[in-house]
Swiss-Prot record:
Residues that coordinate or bind Zn(2+) 1: 60, 62, 75, 78
Entry GO MF terms: DNA binding; DNA-directed RNA polymerase activity; magnesium ion binding; zinc ion binding
Provenance organism: Salinispora arenicola (strain CNS-205)
Gene name tied to this protein: rpoC
Official protein name in the record: DNA-directed RNA polymerase subunit beta'
Known role: DNA-dependent RNA polymerase catalyzes the transcription of DNA into RNA using the four ribonucleoside triphosphates as substrates.
Example of a GO cellular component annotation carried by this entry: DNA-directed RNA polymerase complex
Residues reported to bind Zn(2+) 2: 883, 961, 968, 971
Assigned keywords, A-Z: DNA-directed RNA polymerase, Magnesium, Metal-binding, Nucleotidyltransferase, Transcription, Transferase, Zinc
Taxonomy of the source species: Bacteria, Bacillati, Actinomycetota, Actinomycetes, Micromonosporales
Signal peptide: none
Enzyme Commission code: 2.7.7.6
Disulfide bonds: none
Top enzyme class: transferase
UniProt feature coiled coil, ranges: none
Amino acid sequence: MLDVNFFDELRIGLATADDIRQWSHGEVKKPETINYRTLKPEKDGLFCEKIFGPQRDWECYCGKYKRVRFKGIICERCGVEVTRSKVRRERMGHIELAASVTHIWYFKGVPSRLGYLLDLAPKDLEKIIYFASYVVTSVDAEARHRDLATIENEILAEKRQSENSRDSEIEKRAGKLEADLAELEAEGAKADVRRKVKEGGEREMRQIRDRAQREIDRLDEVLDTFRKLEPKQLVTDELLYRELRDRFGEYFTGGMGAEAIKALVQNMDLDAEAESLRETIRTGKGQRKIRALKRLKVVAAFLNTRNSPLGMVLDCVPVIPPDLRPMVQLDGGRFATSDLNDLYRRVINRNNRLKRLIDLGAPEIIVNNEKRMLQEAVDALFDNGRRGRPVTGPGNRPLKSLSDMLKGKQGRFRQNLLGKRVDYSGRSVIVVGPKLKLHQCGLPKQMALELFKPFVMKRLVDLNHAQNIKSAKRMVERQRPVVWDVLEEVIGEHPVLLNRAPTLHRLGIQAFEPQLVEGKAIQIHPLVCTAFNADFDGDQMAVHVPLSAEAQAEARILMLSSNNILKPADGKPVTMPTQDMIIGLYHLTHRTSGERGEGRAFSSDAEARMAFDNGELHLQAPVKIRLRGLVGVETGPGAESWTAPEGWVEGDPITVETTLGRVLFNEALPPGYRFVNYEIRKGQLSAIVNDLAERFPKVALAATLDGLKEAGFHWATWSGVTIGMEDVLAPPRKREVLDRYEKEADRIDKQYQRGLMTAEERRGELIEIWTKATNEVAKEMDTALPQENPLWKMINSGARGNLLQLRQIAAIRGLVANPKGEIIPRPIKASYREGLSVLEYFISTHGARKGLADTALRTADSGYLTRRLVDVSQDVIIREEDCGTDRAIPMQVGQQTGEAGSLVVHEHAETSVHARTLADDIKGPDGTVVAERGADINSILVDRIVAAGVESVRVRSVLTCESKLGVCGACYGRSLPTGKTVDVGEAVGIIAAQSIGEPGTQLTMRTFHTGGVAGEDITQGLPRVQEIFEARIPKGKAPIADTPGRVRLEDGERSRKIIVVPDDGSDEIVYDKISKRVRLLANDGDHVEVGEKLTVGTIDPHELLRILGPRAVQVHLTQEVQEVYRSQGVLIHDKHIEIIIRQMLKRVTVIDSGSTEFLPGVLVDRALFESENRRLVSEGGEPAAGRPVLMGITKASLATDSWLSAASFQETTRVLTDAAIHARSDSLIGLKENVIIGKLIPAGTGISKYRNVRVEPTEEAKAKVYSMTGYPETDYGFGPASGQAVPLDDFDFGSYR
């Protein structure tokens, strides 16, 4: 087998019959599989050992040769080669067909490639292939022209002869009729008898006349058809074709079936065809030009490649290796077999029958029928169900053909090449491990022993506990006590990977140091649950063991959970104390007046703790404590900031008014962090962790998080927070409030009954009334709840729940929606604490069910979106440090605020400007340089820029990056998950796709009706994101001005027209069929600028691209996506969205090909287009003209240069058909293609830059070595290199560790 590391490209092409025979190890002649008695393969059958290799290692069929010493011998008795049985996975056979057949992919695919090549309609092609019509394959026009006069004379003579015989026959019959009539008259027959005889005679004469006329017409038709006979002409009348063949067989050839197609293809002159098509494109218009372009693509593909178009017609069919289509014996003696065996059997049966019929000299009609059946059998083998009804197996199930083996989620690409099951892995239920450190996980002993079995066995032998591997294995299986000690030693410092499905982003797989635990559940650190989105209600996780030293190093350095604290989407910490820990820290830092020990002063924190231990001081009592080693005091958001006493220096002792709890809280924070002297809730904690992440090393951050976790759990236990029925306090004035609003509602109902308002108005009024009522009851509840209430504590601290949920439990359920999503104007007045009535319960179930259904749909949709995003961006990798471009994009850093117009940091600066590279120097008003070009923008720099009064800066962006492949580090900016400059080799495309796809599930599904505009749908949430990335024309699209000008409105009967009168006096632009319901943004007489929206609605990005160009579209799409995510409170950095948009705008449509090889109308990569044009201009040629195109992500994925990647994405057969015809070569640049062929992916340390590192000793080191004495003088000689891979099985590398 070929070693995957020895090639850089993979080409796909059309296999000719010679190729297939070359691959084959023998012809399969019989449809038999295995003998039912001996269970051994039948000779020359589908499992024949002679063709495909032996079933048992080193053993021939008849048993003459057994053992490895006969390796390579071919048995003279049974003809089987003595070799390994695994060759049955790679050796192919073939079936020699008795008649040619066409390949269904090329004939039936859309568009039909055979049809384009031969210029035949698919309908006609089908008639020819399936023996319904004859086709003329060649005409000897010269001979026909030469002999036409003779032939016409012959036909004329025949016609005359026919006319003469007709005349003589009629004359004879007329004479007989006269004689008969005369005889009857003489006999005195009745008039009606005479009439009947006369009519009979005349009818016979008419028939003679008609017969002769038909004969003459047929001769005319034959001559006429012959005169006009052209190659590729169809003759559907069989009798006509036979007569043509019998009379003029030497002037033309023709036939039906695949043989005729083969003859047509052989007779084609591709060069002449291509030239004539190019001429048509130059001169033609409309449909003719479009068809010529499409045909030229196919013709040029065969001209420019080594492909022969004859590959589309098969003379022999390859048979894939038997172990890839196995036959397995089931219990009870029956066999389960792959569907392919049935399909091959059909082909072989029909082929053998056809051979026999041909040998017997059967009539043409029978042979043709058998040929058609053979064609259908081969079609079913290649792509069952593509044409006609699929071939079915038992239970009417369509059989899986070769195409089905590749297609879809269960196909070869997605099931076995992109996702494989791996060894050294296990899975189990997870439980919380509150005692673990951030970088640890608890691994069940039994599981660890199984996973690390080889390591344990080797170590047992090393330590002389076992003599050899075999006895070590026995020791492990019997679980001897010494085994556990060795296991403990082996797993120390050996990280394992934990993964929880679904792995939505890179934090779904992290590395941990395993700690052996009892039981069978994996223990997880509580802080990593957010990243895995794990909880302990029965979730399971998988464990994988990295084996090689490199894999272990990567796991430890890159994937360890303590190094994955920041979220790739926005660079914020994801490892946050949650729930119990927040309650604990809230309790710890809460301040309560009037508690024991309030107002006392302590000389040190130790003294205060002693007072607490003795029961003289309450944790939350305000006291004064003298603290040492402080760098400052943080008083929290909204409070007056702390001012240091005069003369105080950092580190000096200082007395602070605080609580003991806050002192204990600060002990968890790293030294050198300001003293936190305020109540800790979720938001404040998040800000602290954010701050720590920016200012302290990862080690300190991990230790702090562990400290916070410990403190949180400990004090949560101490706080004794519980919920009882008594804690759910109903608002005392609830009844009174509801009665008041009930009267209001009655008043509205009465007005409606009197006809004073419409049903719609009544509904609106009622909803408004009950919304007010609900809010008022909720307010009542807020005031009634005491601060000590545990529910209030949970909500106030941000640990769990919100006021809306509490309102439903304790106060009032409020208004609910029906299944359509409309609000029911009658509220549920009860709370869950009081209990709902039957009707209330019934109407409240609607919303709950819809919620569950929505969530299920959303999850599937979101997963599919992520898959498409990954596919489109998978080859965007950081390829170089800096592409050196001067291009950049302007971005807002600050925004004006208030009346004074002071400049503050822009609200979205964190997700737009942060983590980017400055493109220019930033100068303040006085001309001093505030920030230099190439600086990394962080929050400190942003503050400095805004303080200097600068509102907008130019930054580098992936949208303007000029790297040929992927993007460069400078244009990408800082890596968000690491907080450092991005490394060359980082797979930023996949990170971008994950960052956008992962929060997809949180986005709402619904497209809802806005209150103001009745019936106008606004797409929101996930469907809107899909609409943007698929570049679809949006629902409710708004027209935009093509040119600056004045607006004129014209109202029609049902719709209105907007007319823009351009400023430059050119023709007016009319936008018609605009609904009267749509709100206008430009009124009569207004002046509009180019690209301005004329009505309310969504802009069509394709229009925007046409009018304002790519930059406007990039800004628009980024803003639109961000709008959806921000509405749900999800933060995603712009750069992730920009990477996807860059991929969507990567192609250019060629309008005029100039002197280039590009065909007009084809999509070309922008970089290739520009470099080709530059080359032509430098050589004095005419450059091509093109137009940028916005492609949806699905289309962009399928248009990628890598056919492997596209085929594994969607429409597998179409992609492979196209790639084979164009003999596409995949240069294995992206990640998917390398995963598919089993190479190391070119990202991270797998990128060639890092793979080709050589260690060069310095000159001093060399001199030092050369000056060393005591080395024997030796000359090493090497034999000539073979250039082949060395089989690693033959070498002993000793220890792997």
